[in-house]
Amino acid sequence: SVGFKAGVKEYKLTYYTPEYQTKDTDILAAFRVTPQPGVPPEEAGAAVRAESSTGTWTTVWTDGLTSLDRYKGRCYHXEAVLGEEDQYIAYVAYPLDLFEEGSVTNMFTSIVGNVFGFKALRALRLEDLRIPNAYIKTFQGPPHGIQVERDKLNKYGRPLLGCTIKPKLGLSAKNYGRAVYECLRGGLDFTKDDENVNSQPFMRWRDRFLFCAEAIYKAQAETGEIKGHYLNATAGTCEEMIKRAVFARELGVPIVMHDYLTGGFTANTSLAHYCRDNGLLLHIHRAMHAVIDRQKNHGMHFRVLAKALRLSGGDHIHAGTVVGKLEGERDITLGFVDLLRDDFIEKDRSRGIYFTQDWVSLPGVXPVASGGIHVWHMPALTEIFGDDXRXQFGGGTLGHPWGNAPGAVANRVALEACVKARNEGRDLAVEGNEIIREASKWSPELAAACEVWKEIRFNFKAVDTLDPS
């Protein structure tokens, strides 16, 4: 009979379509699905698709008022994960019409908004997204990008050096500005607010901005180099955040900062648009990311958060170090570093890249290595990240036995020695320690740093690793 038939139906009958040919305009997703015992992978994969597109738990009469075939997400392939008896990678295609243009917020609300609480699933992780060209073109992306930043700063041919001011909380604005000045005059390109420095009773944001601007201009006058400090504009409301960015622009400083996950994608995109319109660079901190991305079987991989940030907008983003104190396995890290910087990235499962991604000339984002790094790590960082990166030495600058400025000198000397050696054809991975020792013979600041940190190691096994192939 023709008409509406009530009742509960199996998701796989509607949403599991292995014969589907994906379109260039589809958003493609790779989910790591761990079904409850007794739930077949096709049903679990189709359930994910249904909840994140047109489905609900029962047949509804309003299904007949639209074209479900046009709007539904489709699970078009499922594959078992090697070495895991109950995990599957489910590949899903979402039609582009399901998403609002230029909105990372809407994209995530649709794809990961409700489905992670599904009872049929023990765990679920979004491993990767393929963003189609048609959707990318609805986003502004990074305010400026890697090349424009180099032109603004007049710095070429090497990574840029930074330092997070410590202690992160408790300094007065004047003492904070003094620490900034010492680091910048010693040879760093940038200093940085920590992610939780906003506007607390011991240091209100306006005072911090003023003293940091004074430090920047004094260091610039003494060194002849353009300097910057990542002024954290993150605030409790979008209006307050923009007010802080406006004040930074009025001071004439080159860069502001945002905590994009705690601040939210709507706020981040708003700030990125303001920065593009007003010539400010935008540094992005990923505070809270490990809550979402650290567990291998549940949550969302950082490569997805990195792609989302490139759409939403940011000129730098923290991306792990491989060698420091924070989580980050080498092949995985290099995979999403390429997704941040390059214009075209081929599918490469050996680096965790599930889809070929074309960014159609959207500006790139410079990865920031930060967390537990010091001068002995400089050869590895230069070799791993190349020139288009930012190396942030917080304790590795401020912990120098002679003070901030000598700490900055040590890092700058180590960096320039590594870049020079690399340009001469030396292998940083093999000769790194020798290169640092040679440079320390003529730099007492570097020699002192080498002595302090010669025994420091962070040797822990990464939690998030690649699947066996």
From Swiss-Prot:
Keyword Chloroplast found: yes
Molecular function, one GO term: magnesium ion binding
Location of N6,N6,N6-trimethyllysine modifications: K5
Pfam families, per the entry: RuBisCO_large, RuBisCO_large_N
PROSITE patterns: RUBISCO_LARGE (PS00157)
Swiss-Prot/TrEMBL catalytic activity: 2 (2R)-3-phosphoglycerate + 2 H(+) = D-ribulose 1,5-bisphosphate + CO2 + H2O; D-ribulose 1,5-bisphosphate + O2 = 2-phosphoglycolate + (2R)-3-phosphoglycerate + 2 H(+)
Enzyme Commission no: 4.1.1.39
Feature type site, description Transition state stabilizer: K325
Keywords noted in UniProt: Calvin cycle, Carbon dioxide fixation, Chloroplast, Disulfide bond, Lyase, Magnesium, Metal-binding, Methylation, Monooxygenase, Oxidoreductase, Photorespiration, Photosynthesis, Plastid
Modification comment: The disulfide bond which can form in the large chain dimeric partners within the hexadecamer appears to be associated with oxidative stress and protein turnover.
Cofactor binding note: Binds 1 Mg(2+) ion per subunit.
GO terms classed as biological process: photorespiration; reductive pentose-phosphate cycle
Active-site residues, Swiss-Prot/TrEMBL: K166, H285
Amino-acid positions noted as binding Mg(2+) in the UniProt annotation, renumbered to this chain: K192, D194, E195
Intracellular or extracellular location(s): Plastid, Chloroplast
Residues bearing the modification N6-carboxylysine: K192
Additional record remark: The basic functional RuBisCO is composed of a large chain homodimer in a 'head-to-tail' conformation. In form I RuBisCO this homodimer is arranged in a barrel-like tetramer with the small subunits forming a tetrameric 'cap' on each end of the 'barrel'.
Protein family (similarity comment): Belongs to the RuBisCO large chain family. Type I subfamily.
HAMAP family, per the entry: RuBisCO_L_type1
Function text: RuBisCO catalyzes two reactions: the carboxylation of D-ribulose 1,5-bisphosphate, the primary event in carbon dioxide fixation, as well as the oxidative fragmentation of the pentose substrate in the photorespiration process. Both reactions occur simultaneously and in competition at the same active site.
Name of the protein this chain belongs to: Ribulose bisphosphate carboxylase large chain
Organism per entry: Antirhea lucida
Lineage: Eukaryota, Viridiplantae, Streptophyta, Embryophyta, Tracheophyta
